[in-house]
Every structure is written in structure tokens, then in C-alpha cells.
Amino acid sequence: MKIHRFFLLAVAAFIFISGPFAGAESDWLTDYKKAQQEAKAGNKFLLLDFTGSDWCGWCKKFDREVLLQSEFKNYARENLVVVELDFPRAKPQTSELRKQNRELAQQYDIVGFPTIVVLSADGQKLWRYDGYFPDGPAAFIAQLQKLRKG
């Protein structure tokens, strides 16, 4: 009986802990060409997140403190097409995805993680931020809103 109760408690804890992360990935694309099409169709900015999701401490912190926050997720859903360009060490990726991510990293001169690149719907580079963004989701959103205003 104790083992059964412990098992149920462990499952409940897993669901509780993983819940906030489940929705974040669903809005993020990994296919850059598809993201470009969506950005054009919706006249939205394209936010490229160059990350090392399974090893980069600053990337994980940025995800946790900015990108996974409901304030950012709500803003992104209405205003952005978000693309994760991941360079994992252990997480499996297709060869096509690795190739796409390497080519984009080269195109945008990515030398460290995290790096955010924001493009207009027509592909013009509007903003780049290298490293961890320390000021939280509200300040990050404010920066993105400045780009909209020109």
C-alpha cells in the first residue's frame, strides 16, 4: 500500500512539475522555412532563439525566467513566430535540423548561447541580443514592442 501511494505521489509531482513546460514547446517551431511562411502570413516578427537547451546554464535560466513565463508566452502568441534553433549535446536531432541550425548560426554569426535574433516578417534583421537577458519578461517584451514602433 505504501509503495502504491508513493508511486501516485511521484506521478502527481511529475505532472505538477512538468505542467508549466508542456505548453511552452507547443508554440515553438524548429522548421525555419515554415516559421518564415507563418511570419509573412500573419505579419509577425520572427524570434530566433539560438540555444543549447540541454547543457547551457544561461539558456535554461533565460527559458525559465523569460521565455516560459505566461506574460511572454501570451505576447508571443499574438505578435511573434518563435523558433528554437537548438544545439544540444545529448538530445537527438535529425541531420536536416542540425544542418539547418548550423547554417542559420553561420548566417547570423552566432558565437555563444543564448542569442536572440528578431527578424521582420520579410526577413530583415531588427534586433540581436547575445547572452542572458536579466531584466525579466516585461522588459524583454518592452524591447520587442519598441521594434514594432520603429
Question: Each PLM stretch: what is its role?
Answer:
Residues 9-18:
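Bacterial N-terminal signal peptides
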Residues 28-29, 68-99:
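Thiol-based oxidoreductase modules, predominantly thioredoxin-like and allied folds used
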Residues 43-46, 51-55, 112:
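Short pre-active-site segment immediately N-terminal to redox-active cysteine/selenocysteine motifs
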Residues 65-67, 103-150:
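Non-catalytic, surface beta->alpha helical segment in thiol-disulfide oxidoreductase systems
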Residues 1-10:
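Bacterial N-terminal signal peptides that target proteins for export
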